[in-house]
Amino acid sequence: MIEVRNVSKSYGGQAVLDDVSCVIPAGGITSIIGPNGAGKSTLLSLISRLQPLEAGAVSVAGLDVAATDSRELARTMAILRQENHLTMRLTVRDLVAFGRFPHSGGRPTVEDLAKVEESIAHLDLTPMADKFVDELSGGQRQRAFIAMVLAQDTQYLLLDEPLNNLDMKHSVEMMRLLRRLADEFGKTIVLVVHDINFASCYSDTILAMKDGRLVHQGSPRQIMQQAMLRDVYDIDIRIEDIDGNRIGVYFA
């Protein structure tokens, strides 16, 4: 379980998060949705300690995020940033192997190497495992970074816009993989996603943010309602039921 208590954050005197509190249940997929500037990525970065807390507290699996040893935290949760940059030239396999560092300390075992290959295969990257990351397309690079996070093999996965640069096929495959990790391996997955229909079809819980506040939290069927989405996005979104899922139609 992830507990966020009265968390606030500001940049240059401008509030980005304003007294946010929530409980994210253990297990399953929780999607964070909302318009640009809502504070979604900032919330995820505070949960993962990529940024320091200014006010409030965060705990993950009972661990105080602000006080827990970095290596212990890295064995508990893995984070995919929205923007990822490399300062050295690495192959896909080398990059994914970094995900094992919290476990191996830089001395990978046979088990570590097997986990690397398994993660590469999960993201359909085996044919390009020996290619340099800077030779890949944007979507292939995104999958390589996600494979690195997957190789970390933590109970909690925090993913900031994991569908960036992915085409329709790989977006669906990514969400199916995350669903499988939650259902078969008991992972707790928290992701920022802009496509409300992916959130609706694959999530157990949705957090809706706006103007630095958490404005709604509930199941997809609770959140995917016209009045509620209008409150979040300030546009009218028609809701259709398709194969048991609520789908938002907002482009017509």
Model-assigned labels for residue ranges:
Residues 33-35:
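The feature captures the beta-strand-to-loop junction immediately N-terminal to the Walker
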Residues 48:
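Helix-to-loop junction immediately C-terminal to a conserved catalytic motif
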Residues 56-64, 73:
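Conserved ABC transporter NBD signature motif
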Residues 97, 110-128, 158:
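Conserved ABC ATPase "signature" region
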Residues 132-136, 140:
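Conserved ABC ATPase signature
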